[in-house]
C-alpha cells in the first residue's frame, strides 16, 4: 500500500493535488492531507510515507499566518530521530521567488521543487507512484496483518454455498476473516441485458475499494461462482485495487467469462499468488450463456486459453454447481489449497476426436446465433417501416 502525505494550506491547491492522486488510483486513506506544519510533523512521527508533497509557505498551526520558510523548516526537522523520513519529497509553490530561493536546498537532498502553475509536478507525482508500485511488486515480501476471503455468489441463487464454505473454513481456522458478498437475485432474463446489471458491477467495485481502505495491510483472496467471477475479475482488471492492496489466491468456478479473456494482463497487474479456474464439463447453463449473452462466455466449462504458471484450469465431470453439490469437493480440493498451498491437478475431460468436434461446434454457435438474431430483428424492423 502506498502512503502519501500532503501538507498544503491552500484549499484549491490541496484539492488539485488530491485529484491528481485519485486519477492515479490513490484513494483515501492511502493519502492524508494537512494544512499546517504542526499537524504534518505529528503525522511524520507516526507513519513512514512513500511521498511527501510539501508546500513551501505554510502556517505553524491552522489558526496562524503562513511563513515563507514553513515547508523548508519541516525539511530541517526530518533528520531528527523521532521522525520517519519519507522516501520521496516533492516541493510545490506558486511563488517564483520562493522557487528560486529554495531550489538549491531541495536539490542538496536530491529532491525537486515545482511551480504549481506548471503541470510538471503532476507528472512527477504520477512517475513516483508508478515507480513505487513497480518496486513493491518486485521486492516486497508480503507479510499482511491477515488474510481475508471474499465469497461471491452467482445469479438465481441466495448463495448457500457461501455459508457451507464459511463453516468449513472456520472449523479449520476459527479466526479467519470471511466476507460473504451478496447482491439482489437476478433472473436469467435480466442477465441478458448489460444495462440491467451495471449497478451491481459498480457496487462491487465500490465494495472492494472500501475493503482495501478498511484493511490496508491485508491480503485479499477471492472465491467466486458464475456471475460472481465476472464481478471479481473485471473489478481487479479495471480498477486500481493493486495499488492499495495485496491480492492472494483466487478461485473461480462456473465462470461466465470468455475463454479468451486477457488473464495474462490481470496476472501481470495484480500479481496474485495463484488463480484456480474450476470447470464443469457438463455445464449446460454456460453453453447457453456463451451462445446467447453478449459479452459473456464459458470459461467455466472450457477453461481459459493461453498459459501462465499462476493460472490453473481444473476440469470436473459435473455441471454448473458441481463444486457445491459434490460431497467432499471443498474438503478435497479447496481446503488444502487455502490452508496448505497444495494444488491438486484434475482433468476429467475425454480427449477424443468426437469430443473435440462437439466443442468446435459449440464454439461456433455464438458466431451464428447472435448475428442471425440481429439480422432477423433488422429485417423485421425494415418490414415494419416499409
Swiss-Prot record:
Probably phosphorylated by DtcA. The keyword Cell membrane applies. The chain crosses the membrane at residues 362-382. GO terms for biological process: defense response to virus; phosphorelay signal transduction system. Keywords: Antiviral defense, Cell membrane, Hydrolase, Membrane, Phosphoprotein, Transmembrane, Transmembrane helix, Two-component regulatory system. It is found in: Cell membrane. It is a single-pass membrane protein. The AB hydrolase domain is probably activated upon phosphorylation by DtcA. Residues 127-284 form the AB hydrolase-1 domain. Residues 3-129 form the Response regulatory domain. GO terms for molecular function: hydrolase activity. One of its GO terms (cellular component) is plasma membrane. The modification 4-aspartylphosphate is found at residue 55. It is an enzyme of class 3 (hydrolase). Its EC number is 3.-.-.-. InterPro entries: AB_hydrolase_fold (IPR029058), CheY-like_superfamily (IPR011006), Sig_transdc_resp-reg_receiver (IPR001789). Has an N-terminal response-regulator domain, a central AB hydrolase domain and a C-terminal membrane domain. Probable response protein of the two-component regulatory system Detocs that confers resistance to bacteriophage. When the system (DtcA-DtcB-DtcC) is expressed in a susceptible E.coli (strain MG1655) it confers resistance to bacteriophages T2, T4, T5, T7, SECphi4, SECphi6 and SECphi27; the level of resistance varies, resistance to T2, T7 and SECphi4 is not very high. This is Detocs response regulatory AB hydrolase DtcC. It comes from Enterobacter cloacae (strain JD6301). The gene is dtcC.
Amino acid at each position: 500500500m502506498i502512503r502519501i502525505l500532503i501538507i498544503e494550506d491552500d484549499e484549491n491547491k490541496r484539492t488539485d493535488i488530491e485529484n491528481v492522486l485519485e486519477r492515479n488510483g490513490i484513494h483515501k486513506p492511502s493519502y492524508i492531507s494537512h494544512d499546517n506544519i504542526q499537524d504534518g510533523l505529528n503525522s511524520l512521527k507516526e507513519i513512514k510515507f512513500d511521498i511527501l508533497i510539501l508546500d513551501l509557505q505554510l502556517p505553524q498551526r491552522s489558526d496562524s499566518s503562513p511563513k515563507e520558510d514553513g515547508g523548508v523548516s519541516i525539511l530541517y526537522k526530518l533528520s531528527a530521530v523521532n521522525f520517519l523520513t519519507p522516501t520521496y519529497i516533492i516541493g510545490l509553490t506558486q511563488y517564483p521567488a520562493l522557487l528560486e530561493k529554495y531550489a538549491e536546498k531541495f536539490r542538496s537532498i536530491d529532491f525537486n521543487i515545482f511551480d504549481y502553475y506548471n503541470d510538471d509536478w503532476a507528472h512527477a507525482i504520477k512517475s513516483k507512484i508508478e515507480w513505487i508500485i513497480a518496486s513493491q511488486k518486485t521486492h516486497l515480501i508480503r507479510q499482511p496483518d491477515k488474510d481475508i476471503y471474499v465469497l461471491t455468489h452467482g445469479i438465481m441463487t441466495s448463495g448457500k454455498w457461501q455459508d457451507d464454505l464459511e463453516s468449513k473454513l472456520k472449523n479449520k481456522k476459527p479466526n479467519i476473516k470471511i466476507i460473504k458478498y451478496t447482491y439482489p437475485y437476478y433472473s436469467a432474463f435480466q442477465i441478458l441485458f448489460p444495462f440491467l446489471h451495471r449497478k451491481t458491477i459498480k457496487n462491487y467495485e465500490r465494495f472492494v475499494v472500501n475493503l482495501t481502505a478498511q484493511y490496508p495491510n491485508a491480503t485479499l483472496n477471492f472465491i467466486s461462482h458464475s456471475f460472481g467471477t465476472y464481478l471479481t475479475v473485471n473489478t481487479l482488471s479495471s480498477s486500481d485495487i493493486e495499488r492499495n492492496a495485496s491480492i492472494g489466491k483466487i478461485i473461480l468456478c462456473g465462470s461466465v467469462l470468455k475463454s479468451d479473456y486477457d488473464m495474462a494482463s490481470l496476472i501481470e497487474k495484480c500479481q496474485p499468488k495463484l488463480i484456480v479456474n474450476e470447470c464443469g464439463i457438463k455445464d449446460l447453463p454456460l453453453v447457453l450463456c456463451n451462445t446467447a449473452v453478449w459479452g459473456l462466455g464459458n470459461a467455466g466449462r472450457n477453461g481459459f486459453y493461453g498459459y501462465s504458471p499462476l493460472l490453473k484450469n481444473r476440469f470436473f465431470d459435473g455441471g454448473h454447481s458441481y463444486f457445491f453439490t459434490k460431497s467432499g469437493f471443498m474438503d478435497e480440493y479447496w481446503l488444502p489449497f487455502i490452508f496448505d498451498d497444495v494444488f491438486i491437478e484434475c482433468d476429467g475431460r475425454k480427449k477424443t476426436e468426437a469430443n473435440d468436434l462437439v466443442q468446435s461446434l459449440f464454439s461456433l454457435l455464438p458466431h451464428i446465433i447472435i448475428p442471425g438474431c440481429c439480422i432477423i430483428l433488422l429485417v423485421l424492423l425494415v418490414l415494419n417501416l416499409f
